[in-house]
Regions:
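Active-site proximal loop and beta-alpha junction motif in alpha/beta enzyme cores
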Residues: 1-79, 85-175
Length: 175
């Protein structure tokens, strides 16, 4: 990445306290970065996730949402909740989202598909504990895909614990 500069911000998600919560790095304009460079930057950030916003023309963003890619230090993810909420909040609160000042919803266009995130202020959170100054984000995730189930014995053997340490109340299943 010779002679290129990319701005990023680091947010503390799920908290109002600095240096608490779950940290997230967000590259605010990742145009020009290839997959390997995004992966290298995520590895350099060394956080659980790093997101890369790829701005598009306003008409496409209004129709398709904000293009965002999510990386861990090891690989790209099609979806993860923490970076989706954190990136959507950053867009909601910044001038990068050209329509965010007119709408309470930001749609992210991720590898997994489009994920709408709706924001509400305290006065709109009926039935929830009010916390001054907070904004609440809700996202509609895709339906889960349920995969293979595993026996308690198999899981106990793999993780090195006794079978009776695993509850038999619920199935053990890949989701």
């Amino acid at each position: 990445m010779p002679d290129r500069t990319y701005e990023f911000v680091q947010l503390d998600v799920f908290t109002q306290t600095a240096l608490a919560g779950n940290p997230l790095a967000i590259f605010t304009d990742a145009r020009g970065l290839n997959d390997a460079e995004m992966q290298a930057l995520a590895r350099e950030m060394n956080l659980s996730e790093t997101t890369f916003i790829l701005p598009r023309d306003p008409a496409t963003e209004a129709r398709e949402g904000k293009k965002v890619r999510i990386f861990t230090v090891e690989q790209e993810l099609p979806f993860a909740g923490h970076p989706t909420l954190g990136t959507a909040l950053h867009l909601y609160a910044s001038d990068l989202a050209s329509n965010s000042t007119k709408s309470d919803q930001i749609t992210l266009d991720l590898k997994a598909g489009k994920i709408p995130v709706r924001f509400t202020a305290n006065s709109e959170n009926a039935g929830r504990e009010r916390v001054d100054g907070q904004v609440f984000g809700e996202m509609r995730q895709h339906e889960p895909e349920f995969g293979t189930t595993f026996s308690r014995e198999e899981v106990a053997r793999v993780i090195g614990i006794a079978v009776d340490e695993i509850s038999s109340e619920w199935p053990i299943q890949a989701v």
